[in-house]
Amino acid sequence: MHPFCPGYDREPFRSLASGYPGPDVYPPRDFRVEWGPIFHRGRLDGTARVLVLGQDPATHETITRRILVGEAGQRVQGLLARLGITSSYTMVNTFVFSVFGQGGGTRHTHDPAIAAYRHRWLDALLLPETVTAVIALGTLAKTAYRDWADTQPAAAARLHLAAIRHPTFPESASAAGGVTLADATANLLQDWNKHLPDLRAHVEPDEPVPERLYGDTWQDGDLQAIPVADLPAGSPSWWTSLDGWARRTGTDAQLKRATITVTIPSAARTWPPLT
C-alpha cells in the first residue's frame, strides 16, 4: 500500500482551497502567482498537536504541491523528530504564493488582504484546541502568528509559541556576508536547542524519544526525509529524498522565473541502462 495525503476533502479546508486569493491580493511583481498557491503539509483531520508556520513555498514545493519539502522542510522534519512527533503536525506558510525578489515578502508583512485569508487557515487549525504548540520559522512567520494572535487572544493564550530561526538562516546569513556558513549554522542550532525544552514541555509526543540537543554542525539524522503520507496520491518516492532534485534555471531573469528543472536523483534511476 502507498499512503498519501487526501488533500482538502473536508470543510473548512475545501472552501479554503477553492477560494484562495489571486493576483489582486498577491501582486505578481512580488509573488510567483503563475505557479499557483501551495497551501499546507501534514494533518488536516484534527490530529495535529504542533503547527509549523513557515514563510513561503520554494522550488521543490512548487512541484510537490505541499510546503516545506526541500532542505528547509527536511531540517524541520528532523526538529519534529527530536520532539517525538512523527505524524501529529500540520504546516502552513505566511504566504501561499512563492515570494519573488528581495523584499517581496517584507513589503507585505502586515498586508490586510493577505492576512485575512491566512487568518482563516489559522482559525481552522488553532481554534479547535488540539494544537498545543506553534513553531514559527523566522521573522515573517513570527509576525504573522502575532497578527493572528491579536485577533484571537483567548486561543493564543493557551498556545506555546516557539519563534525559532528559519531553517535556511545559515545559507542566507552567510550569503549576505559578515558571518561564515559554519558560524551561522552553529548560531541556528544553538537557537533551536534553546527552544527544545519548552517545546517538549508543551507537546505530547507520538512516541517517546531521548532528549537530544544539536551540535554545532549538521549531523547524520538531523535532516529527515519527508513522509510519503504528506504528499499527494501517486507521488514518486524520490520526492521525499534528501537530495535536491529541483532548481530554477534560465539564462536571464525572465526565463528563470518561468522554468523549474527537475532531475531524478541517481539513486532513484532504477530503469535498465540506456545507450
Regions found by a protein language model. Name each.
Residues 1-275:
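A polyanion-binding, active-site-adjacent surface
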